[in-house]
Structures are given as C-alpha cells and as structure tokens.
Amino acid sequence: MKNSPTKNFHILLDRISLTVPEQEAALNRAESVRENLMNFSLVQECVITGSMARSTAIRTFSDVDIIAIINDDPKMMENSKLAISAISDYLARTYSSIEDFDSAVHITLNDGPGIDVVPAFIAGKNTSGHSLFKIPAEQRSWINYDPAGQDQRIEQLSLQLGDEFKQAIRLAKWWSRANGSPIPSYEIEGVMSRTFLKWTEMPTPPEALATFFREADANKPDKVTGHGKSVIRKAALMAQDALELAAQGDTAGSMERWRCLLGEQFPTVVF
C-alpha cells in the first residue's frame, strides 16, 4: 500500500529491539548470576529463560529471567515469601541493588537489563517431557509455570511465520509498557501465539498489532484488571481506526493514531 505506515513500524522496531551484542551481553551477565546462585545450598539448578532468551525482549523494559530451582521445603511451600527472602538475602551479599517482589527478586545493573531471579519448585513434566514449575505468586502462594512450553510455542510459530512473529510480540510489549502494562509480558506472548496459531504468514506490522488487539479484547488474559480491559478495548478501537484511515489514504491521520498507541518513539513522518 502506497504511503502505508509499515515503514514507520520497522523504524520503531529498530529503536525498541536489542541488537545481537546487547542481547548476548545481557545473557552473559545472567550467566554470571546463575553461576553465583549455584553456590547457594538452597539452590539445586538454575535455568535462564524469559523474553531475553526467546528473543522477544524490548529495549529499556525487558529483564533476564533466571529460574532458581530450590530444595523442597515444607515451610517455603506454604509461604512463597520465605523463598523470595532466602534468595534475596543470598544475592545481597554480592549485588548492591536488590528489590523483592511477590514473584521474583530483581537485581538492577548499571550496564544493561536487570535480572529477575524466580525461586521455583519442580512440579512435574509437560507433554513434551520438560519440567513444569511452581513459582511465587501474590498472597504468598505458588502458581504453575511452563517456560519450556512457552519457548517451544514461540519457536514453532517463528519457524512457521518468520521473524515477523517475534516482531509483533515486541510491538505489543512496547504498546503495553507505553500504556501502563495492562497485559503482562508473559501473557502477551500467549495471546500472540493463540492469535496467529493457524496463520500461514504474518500480516504487515500494523495489521498484526490490530489483530492482536482484537483477540486480546475478545478473549482477555486472566490477569487483566478492570482498568486494563478498558485500555485494551480503547487500543482495539484506535488500531482499527488507524487501519481504516490508511486504507482511505489518510496516512498522516493513521500514523497519529499509532503514535497515540505506541508513544513518542513511533515516527510520524510520511514516506
């Protein structure tokens, strides 16, 4: 389509995507933390996972996730906060900037993305034979987590649909961060996978993002709040409006809508 916003989306993707050296440096720093954790008697094994490992991370906002598989402990199984505290106390011996959350211990680093250390118990196997975990959740509880299954779904769809699939995930994550994070990063990957599961090729970036919004609005992820639902509905309507304006030849109007959704990093120049 002449003068479509697609080129503008590619410029945004260049701005928000980590370069290969940046990604490798982040994973190397995570490996150093992983090796440190392996010296902690509570920890059995550590696995580097998450968006950085899956190449769906975005600049500025994405961290590296480390699953720290811990020894079975009845008290910790009843109260996930005890596991968080134990990991935090150990990491504080080495790292100066530590913050505890319900689900992870966050390490802030000055030279790149931070690291989230997530304590976990092994909870069985998924259908492919990979480990399932219990990880901390709100109110000191534990929830199921299947990182290997998520990795497999993302890679299968990336092979099926090309690099454009992961690009669409990055765009959706950037939108979420620019709008108060109505959908958690992990849920965004799930919605995107469900949206394009049966597609044979990806649409253009603006069409892919609008399709994602429609699916997220129709089948909202479990963790989306009432306010988040409103944000998603607004995004779905505005994205559809942006597509219609582009189809009518109003490229400038279309890009103004996308800029409202994606923030100031989205360029509005008409090519």
What is the meaning of each model-derived region?
Residues 1-48, 53-61, 74-78, 107:
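N-terminal regions immediately upstream of nucleotidyltransferase
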Residues 29-42, 86-94, 171, 175, ...:
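Generic non-transmembrane alpha-helical segments
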Residues 60-64, 111-113:
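A short, glycine/Asx- and small/polar-enriched loop/turn
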Residues 67-69:
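Short hydrophobic/aromatic beta-strand micro-patches
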Residues 71-76, 198-200:
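A generic structural motif
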Residues 81-128:
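Conserved catalytic core of two-metal-ion nucleotidyltransferases
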Residues 130-172:
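A structural motif
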Residues 160-271:
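Conserved nucleotidyltransferase catalytic core and NTase-mimicking acidic/glycine-rich helix/loop elements
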